[in-house]
């Protein structure tokens, strides 16, 4: 209803005032390092979708901001996230991108770990010498699942309260039913600095000029219905056929997806965009090595 009102009146949701941000907020390297540490290493970030590791025994590996990760689901269905490095000499424990197995052996000296991170085998232990297996498991990173998303903190030993982090936005996230979608394809995309990249996910001002051959012809440029829950956001974008609702009684309206697109943004790095034809576009946005680079893992899901 809000989107239709904007369409009829040629308006959009607006901030109370304009905000001008200095270029240095995007390019200053000292500020970049401080923000990257506080936002991406000491706070919860989204690292995967539950549907990517759906079954007990499934695993996935990634390298995020230089940190090699091994994400597993154990036999009880619990999700785990480890630094993908052997505790002996630092070799990568698992080189496969994804698969199904319950144990992982380091290719260097064959130390073996369970998918719960426990050290369960030391090659030639009798001659190697005693190893305190209880303290030499894979380095765990705190992680939890909520609403089909895997969240983790990249600083070992640091935890978080995901319910407090998401707040009332948790219900909006759960409504997306992300665990019920299917992964069609994925890719990594290089780009500008993480804040400049993230800005592009939070407005539709660019739709007509940038997306003229894709979603642009179907959506109304610079018409936005915007709501926030703390740092998390939802954008509603009107499709051009929304004018049809002027001739339909409210109680006879079809599903909203026929007339709008909805984008949910989970701070700091996850964008969930329902797009045309029963597909969903997922973006995991991570800072690159400098203030002017970024890496985005983009997934396309099908219903």
Which role does the model predict for each range below?
Residues 3-22:
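Short, contiguous pre-domain boundary segments
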Residues 19-64, 69:
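Non-catalytic accessory segments flanking enzyme active sites
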Residues 33, 37, 41, 84-87, ...:
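A broad, structural surface signal
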Residues 41-45, 94, 205-209:
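Short amphipathic alpha-helical segments with coiled-coil-like heptad repeat character
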Residues 41-53, 122-127, 264-269:
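Short Pro/Gly-enriched beta-strand edge/turn motifs at strand-loop
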Residues 52-156, 160, 164-167:
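Rieske [2Fe-2S] iron-sulfur-binding domain
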Residues 73, 84, 144, 149-303:
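C-terminal catalytic domain of Rieske-type non-heme iron oxygenases
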């Amino acid at each position: 209803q809000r989107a239709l009102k904007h369409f009829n009146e040629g308006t959009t949701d607006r901030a109370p005032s304009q905000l001008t941000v200095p270029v240095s907020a995007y390019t200053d390297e000292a500020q970049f390092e401080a923000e990257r540490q506080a936002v991406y290493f000491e706070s919860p970030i989204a690292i995967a979708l539950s549907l990517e590791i759906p079954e007990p025994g499934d695993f996935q590996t990634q390298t995020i901001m230089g940190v090699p990760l091994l994400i597993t689901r154990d036999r009880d269905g619990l999700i785990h996230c480890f630094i993908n490095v052997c505790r002996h000499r630092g070799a990568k424990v698992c080189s496969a991108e994804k698969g199904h197995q319950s144990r992982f052996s380091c290719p260097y000296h064959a130390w073996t770990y369970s998918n719960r991170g426990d050290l369960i085998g030391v090659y030639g232990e009798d001659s190697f010498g005693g190893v305190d297996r209880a303290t030499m498991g894979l380095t765990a990173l705190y992680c939890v699942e909520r609403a089909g998303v895997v969240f983790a903190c990249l600083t070992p030993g640091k935890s978080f309260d995901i319910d407090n982090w998401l707040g009332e936005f948790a219900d909006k996230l759960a409504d997306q039913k992300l665990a019920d979608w299917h992964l069609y394809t994925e890719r990594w995309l290089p780009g500008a600095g993480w804040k400049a990249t993230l800005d592009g996910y939070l407005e539709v001002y660019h739709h007509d000029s940038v997306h003229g051959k894709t979603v642009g012809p179907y959506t109304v440029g610079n018409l936005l219905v915007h709501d926030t829950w703390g740092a998390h956001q939802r954008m509603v974008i009107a499709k051009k056929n929304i004018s049809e609702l002027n001739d339909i009684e409210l109680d006879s309206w079809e599903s909203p997806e026929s007339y709008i697109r909805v984008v949910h943004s989970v701070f700091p790095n996850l964008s969930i965009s329902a797009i045309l034809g029963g597909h969903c576009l997922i973006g995991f946005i991570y800072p690159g090595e400098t203030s002017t680079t970024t890496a985005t893992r983009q997934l396309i899901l099908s219903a």
